[in-house]
Amino acid sequence: RSPTECVQTAQADITVQTAVLEARFLAGSAGLFAQMQAQLAEVAEPAQFLQGKLAEQAKRHAKFGPSPYALEPNCKESPGALRDLHLLYWGMRMADLCSADTRFWQAAVDAQLLDAQEAQNLAQSWAFIASVRCHLHQLAGREEDRLLFDWQIPLARAMGYAHHEVSSASGTSIYTRSASAAFMRDYYAAIKLGLQMLE
C-alpha cells in the first residue's frame, strides 16, 4: 500500500489507525514511512480517536468484568491491564506529546501530566505486567493472557517469588505466605496504578 492508502484505511478503521500510530520504522524506505506519518498527523482527529478507544475500553471492561481484582484476570484486556496502559500511550501519541521512540511516561513528566514519582511507578507497573504476559506465554507455549489458577504458581516461581513464613516479633511462625499470593498481590497493585492513571 502507498502512504495515502495506509492513511485512508486508518481513517476508516480505528484498529488500523492504532497500528499506524504505533508503527516504527524498521526497514525499507524511510521517506515513505515519514510521508505516511506526516499524512496521518494532518488528518488525525485526536478527540474522535480517543472517543473510539474509550468505547473499545468500555466494551472490553464489560466483557472481562468491571473489577480489576478478578481471581483469574486477563493480563492484557482486564481493567488496569496492558490495553488500559496502551490507551494512555495512544492518547499521548495522538496528542503529539510523545513519539514512538520516546518513553511516554517521561514525556508525560515533560508535559506536566505526571510528576517524576508517578512516572516511575507507571513505568514499573507497565514493565511488571508486560513481564507477566511474556512469562505466561513462555510457560503456556502459546499466546495465553488469562492468569488461570493453574498458571499462578508456576508463573510466580518463574518470576522469582517464593513461599516464606511470616513470623511474630517473638519468632513464632504465624502463617506461610505462598509465592502465588505474593505474586498476585503485586499484580493487583500494578493494575490498580494503571486504573488510577486513567482517571
Label for each model-derived stretch:
Residues 1-199:
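A nucleotide- and high-energy phosphate-metabolite-utilizing enzyme signature
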